[in-house]
C-alpha cells in the first residue's frame, strides 16, 4: 500500500467516522427525549 494513499485517505476516514459518531449520538439523544416525552 502506497503511503501517499494512506496520507490522503486517513483524514477523510477520520472525518467521516467523526461525523457518523456525532450524528449517531444526536439521534440517540432525540430517541431518548421522545421516549421520555411519551412517558411523561
From Swiss-Prot:
Q: Which GO terms describe its cellular component?
A: photosystem II; plasma membrane-derived thylakoid membrane
Q: Does the keyword Transmembrane helix apply?
A: yes
Q: How does it sit in the membrane?
A: Single-pass membrane protein
Q: Which cysteines are joined by disulfide bonds?
A: none
Entry annotated with the keyword Transmembrane helix: yes
Provide one Gene Ontology biological process annotation.
Answer: photosynthesis
Keywords, A to Z, come to:
Membrane, Photosynthesis, Photosystem II, Thylakoid, Transmembrane, Transmembrane helix
**Segments crossing the lipid bilayer:** 5-23
Subcellular location field: Cellular thylakoid membrane
Family in the record: Belongs to the PsbY family.
State how it assembles: PSII is composed of 1 copy each of membrane proteins PsbA, PsbB, PsbC, PsbD, PsbE, PsbF, PsbH, PsbI, PsbJ, PsbK, PsbL, PsbM, PsbT, PsbX, PsbY, PsbZ, Psb30/Ycf12, peripheral proteins PsbO, CyanoQ (PsbQ), PsbU, PsbV and a large number of cofactors. It forms dimeric complexes.
What is known about what this protein does?
Loosely associated component of the core of photosystem II (PSII), it is not always seen in crystals. PSII is a light-driven water plastoquinone oxidoreductase, using light energy to abstract electrons from H(2)O, generating a proton gradient subsequently used for ATP formation.
Name of the protein this chain belongs to: Photosystem II reaction center protein Y
Organism for this UniProt entry: Synechococcus elongatus (strain ATCC 33912 / PCC 7942 / FACHB-805) (Anacystis nidulans R2)
